[in-house]
C-alpha cells in the first residue's frame, strides 16, 4: 500500500500531522516506510518496484517522478505547465492527466529524459477524452479504460476510442 500522510489542521488537530510524506506499508501489515517527504497522488508502477507521484517544481511546473520503494533513484518522467493530476496505467503503457479541467491520455514512454505533456504536446500523441471536464482519474485493472468523475457523475472511455492505433479500434 502506498499513501500520503498529510499535515494536521485546525479541524483535525496537529497531533497526527507529524512526519508527513509518501509511505509504503505491506498489505499484510507492518511498519510504514518513508519513501519521500515531498509529493502527492502516489501510486505503484506496473512492476511494483517504484512509486510514481506528482511534484510541484520551479515556477509551479508539475512533474511525474518515480523513486524506488527505498526512496532512491529519483527519475522525472513527465512535466507539465498546468497538469493537476497524473495517473499511470496499471500496465505502465499510458499516462492520463488533467489539465485546465480536461482529461487527456498519452502513451507513456519511459526514456532517460522527461517528456513535456499537455494538450498541444508534439513528442507523443495526446487525446482529450473528456467532453467537459474531469477529476479523480483512475484506470480499469486491465488498463483498457480510463475513468473519471465530474460532480456526481462517473465517466469511462476505452483507449481504443481515443487512439486509432490501439488494438480493436
Place the predicted regions along the sequence by residue.
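A short helix->beta-strand "capping" segment at the edge of beta-propeller domains
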Residues: 121-130
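An N-terminal, helix-rich hydrophobic module
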Residues: 137-141
Amino acid at each position: 500500500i502506498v499513501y500520503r500522510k498529510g499535515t494536521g489542521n485546525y479541524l483535525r488537530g496537529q497531533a497526527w500531522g507529524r512526519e508527513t510524506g509518501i509511505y509504503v506499508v505491506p498489505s499484510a501489515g507492518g511498519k510504514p516506510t518513508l519513501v519521500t517527504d515531498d509529493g502527492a497522488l502516489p501510486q505503484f508502477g506496473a512492476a511494483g518496484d517504484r512509486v510514481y507521484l506528482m511534484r510541484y517544481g520551479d515556477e509551479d511546473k508539475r512533474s511525474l517522478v518515480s523513486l524506488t520503494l527505498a526512496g532512491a533513484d529519483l527519475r522525472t518522467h513527465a512535466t507539465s505547465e498546468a497538469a493537476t493530476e497524473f495517473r499511470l496505467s496499471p500496465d505502465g503503457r499510458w499516462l492520463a492527466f488533467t489539465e485546465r479541467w480536461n482529461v487527456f491520455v498519452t502513451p507513456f514512454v519511459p526514456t532517460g529524459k522527461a517528456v513535456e505533456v499537455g494538450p498541444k504536446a508534439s513528442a507523443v500523441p495526446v487525446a482529450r477524452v473528456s467532453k467537459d471536464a474531469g477529476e479523480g482519474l483512475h484506470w480499469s485493472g486491465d488498463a483498457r479504460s480510463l475513468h473519471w468523475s465530474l460532480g456526481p457523475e462517473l465517466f469511462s472511455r476505452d483507449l481504443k476510442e481515443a487512439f486509432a492505433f490501439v488494438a480493436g479500434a
